């Protein structure tokens, strides 16, 4: 049994993971959906990391899954606790000394989104419409629930440089979604390659994939966990 530690995207709480958590528990795993102080203007990335470490407690066999802006917190958690695996899901891959606020300009994000809008023939209004960019795979009732459970996101953790000088010593994989309209997949492929030196895994789905495809996401996470953790773990006998 593994313990999946789920670190949410910006402006999200444990509810975001509820469908995925059910899938993982059905497979026999423990799940910690971290409740970050995202609306607290006094809280920075160190406070986010503290919240995750407290939630983990004395659990072991950790698989840390950090989505989107959560990718700034996931490696910090793995610097504090021993994790068997870190999975960055549709991630804002951080770089040493770069603040999350600087990430957008430093990665060429705006140009990638503009190129996507031109390919898709979207108007500027469509490119800013959450129903087009985020919720295009979700049924109306789930969109309503997602909107009702959204949280305010403080700008404080975006202001200070990411503190790690080097990536933590943890097996790391990136999982991208080919239908992601917020972080276009070609943009993330290059970012993951440039910053982590790895080839990402991919699956179908849009950015809020834990809501739109929880079963498929659980399957992919389990495939990655088995590849990394069970192969690396020596067999008795």
Give the positions of each predicted feature.
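Conserved HGGG/HGGXW glycine-rich cap/lid loop of the alpha/beta-hydrolase fold
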Residues: 2-41
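Active-site loop/oxyanion-hole signature of alpha/beta-hydrolase fold enzymes
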Residues: 33-63, 101-109
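Post-His helix in hydrolase/transferase enzymes
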Residues: 48, 211-227
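Gly/Ala-rich beta-loop-alpha elbow adjacent to hydrolase catalytic centers
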Residues: 65-70, 74
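Short beta-strand/loop motif that positions the catalytic acidic residue
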Residues: 168, 174-176
């Amino acid at each position: 049994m593994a313990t999946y530690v789920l670190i949410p995207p910006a402006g999200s709480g444990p509810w975001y993971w509820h469908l995925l958590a059910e899938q993982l528990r059905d497979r026999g795993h423990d799940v910690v959906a971290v409740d970050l102080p995202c609306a607290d203007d006094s809280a920075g990335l160190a406070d986010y990391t503290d919240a995750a470490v407290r939630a983990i407690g004395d659990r072991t066999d950790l698989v840390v899954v950090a989505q989107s802006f959560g990718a700034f917190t996931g490696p910090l958690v793995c610097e504090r606790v021993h994790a068997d695996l870190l999975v960055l899901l549709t991630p804002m891959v951080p770089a040493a000394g770069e603040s999350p606020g600087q990430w957008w300009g430093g990665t060429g994000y705006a140009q990638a989104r503009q190129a996507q809008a031109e390919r898709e023939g979207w108007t500027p209004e469509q490119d800013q419409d959450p129903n087009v960019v985020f919720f295009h795979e979700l049924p109306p009732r789930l969109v309503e629930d997602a909107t009702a459970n959204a949280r305010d996101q403080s700008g404080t953790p975006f202001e200070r440089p990411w503190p790690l000088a080097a990536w933590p010593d943890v097996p790391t994989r990136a999982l991208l979604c080919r239908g992601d309209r917020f972080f276009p997949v070609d943009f993330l492929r290059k970012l993951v390659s440039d910053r982590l030196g790895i080839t990402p895994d991919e699956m179908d789905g849009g950015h809020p994939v834990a809501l739109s495809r929880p079963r498929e996401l659980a399957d992919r996470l389990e495939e990655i966990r088995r590849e990394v953790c069970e192969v690396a773990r020596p067999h008795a006998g």
